């Protein structure tokens, strides 16, 4: 079988599309997925006056030459912000170009506290003023032209770093961001901005230097394949089926992901920029050199992305051996393991951050059942578990999966899965 991993993650597309607010000229972005989070963000940009042209599937041109700042202050816009976490990414480009931004506390995944301090403190250091309306739950941000400065971020926040970068590119003078996130998502945003005329150096490191320019111009950009989707399909192929090829994965941007799966005993074979995951009747978890059982934990890039821990946990349920999954960066992403325990998985939830998985070594199949998807990544993990389980499973709240995976049921059905979308 072959499945083409040529799509992108919602976060990356959202940041890149917001960067189009920094210029009045057209910016063309290719490889945009048809997923709900991205579609909602594009509609939000259209609502504020950005002209969006769909050239072909996944190929859009954005032109922000008639942005309606009055709409940005409207209750309708602010109500939209509460339902879409990506709305916070409008702050950086809007305050940089227009000197004004308003945003309500955004929505998104229910995976614990996701504070906005890094965004706000960084943009404040550039000279912006923040007023918070407690009654409406709205931030009113305003500034003259921002001024470059040195800042040491309190956390290597991906969205916070992106927002500060976009605010800095039009600031006077030089901005230095230390402890910046350096994920491929951030690298690609910086490359896009440089093609638009920005002056950003230190890309791929945690120390970025941004020399402000007077204006940006149009550019063309192709977004990277989504490494989380690639990892999800690796996990799926390990659990069930006769093996798959995943095409055009941008291997050099996968980081530690293939190695992490290999520590669970999963074979990930590279052929150029493609991956092949063979059929796995058996796979065994490594142990550390001193004989202690394996621990997998998330960390800021180039460490393991937290978005794949849910998938790795499910894969471990059918491995031979024991692994500790340690979710350090969020505090509520492991609660979905109760549903896996109901399916017959051997998991001990130690606390909100740690779970011990004792694998079945493919000797005992999971049982199908009813479950609810709490967030994007737990949703795809439960779907993988259901595909490998004995019997029929029913997953509700699949809108969460739709937020991050394009046409997931039709793509998996093409690989031989039996998945049907039903109305409840």
Language model features with spans:
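Structural signal for terminal/edge beta-strands and the immediately following C-terminal loop/tail
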Residues: 333-335, 358, 362, 395-424
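Conserved phosphate/oxyanion-binding catalytic-loop motifs
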Residues: 74, 79-97, 230, 372-381
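Self-splicing inteins and homing endonuclease
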Residues: 5, 42, 50-79, 128-154, ...
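C-terminal structural cap/anchor segments
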Residues: 295-359
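Short glycine/threonine-rich catalytic loop with a Thr-x-Gly-x-Asp
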Residues: 10-11, 160-161, 223-232, 302-309, ...
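Single conserved hydrophobic/aromatic residue that forms the stacking wall/gate
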Residues: 1-9, 14
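Flexible glycine-/small-residue-enriched beta->alpha junction loops
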Residues: 84-97, 115-169
């Amino acid at each position: 079988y072959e499945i083409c991993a040529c799509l992108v993650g919602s976060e990356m597309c959202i940041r890149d599309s917001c960067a189009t607010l920094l210029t009045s000229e057209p910016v063309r972005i290719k490889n945009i997925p048809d997923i709900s989070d991205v579609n909602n963000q594009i509609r939000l940009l259209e609502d504020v006056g950005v002209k969006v042209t769909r050239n072909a599937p996944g190929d859009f041109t954005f032109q922000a030459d008639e942005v309606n700042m009055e709409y940005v202050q409207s209750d309708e816009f602010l109500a939209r912000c509460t339902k879409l976490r990506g709305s916070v990414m409008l702050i950086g480009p809007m305050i940089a170009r227009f000197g004004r931004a308003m945003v309500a506390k955004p929505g998104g995944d229910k995976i614990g506290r996701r504070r906005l301090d890094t965004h706000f403190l960084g943009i404040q250091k550039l000279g912006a003023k923040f007023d918070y309306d407690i009654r409406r739950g709205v931030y009113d941000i305003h500034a003259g032209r921002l001024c470059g400065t040195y800042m040491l971020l309190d956390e290597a926040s991906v969205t916070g770093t992106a927002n500060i970068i976009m605010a800095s590119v039009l600031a006077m003078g030089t901005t230095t961001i230390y402890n910046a996130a350096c994920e491929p998502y951030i690298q690609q945003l910086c490359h896009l901005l440089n093609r638009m005329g920005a002056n950003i150096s230190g890309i791929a490191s945690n120390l970025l230097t941004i020399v402000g320019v007077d204006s940006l111009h149009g550019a063309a950009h192709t977004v990277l394949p989504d490494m989380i989707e690639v990892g999800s399909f690796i996990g799926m192929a390990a659990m069930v089926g006769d093996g798959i090829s995943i095409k055009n994965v941008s291997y050099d941007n996968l980081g530690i992901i293939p190695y992490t799966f290999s520590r669970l005993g999963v074979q990930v074979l590279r052929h150029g920029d493609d991956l092949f995951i063979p059929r796995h009747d058996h796979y065994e978890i490594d142990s550390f050199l001193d004989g202690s059982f394996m621990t997998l934990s998330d960390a800021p890039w180039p460490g393991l992305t937290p978005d794949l821990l849910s998938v790795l946990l499910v894969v471990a349920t059918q491995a031979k051996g024991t692994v500790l999954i340690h979710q350090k960066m969020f505090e509520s992403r492991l609660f979905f393991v109760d549903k896996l325990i109901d399916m017959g998985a051997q998991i001990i939830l130690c606390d909100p951050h740690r779970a011990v998985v004792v694998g079945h070594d493919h000797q005992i199949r999971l049982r199908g059942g009813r479950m609810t998807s709490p967030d994007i990544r737990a949703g795809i993990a439960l779907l993988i578990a259901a595909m490998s389980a004995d019997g029929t499973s029913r997953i509700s709240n699949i809108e969460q999966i739709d937020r991050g995976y394009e046409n997931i049921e039709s793509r998996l059905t093409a690989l031989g899965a039996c998945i049907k979308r039903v109305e409840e």
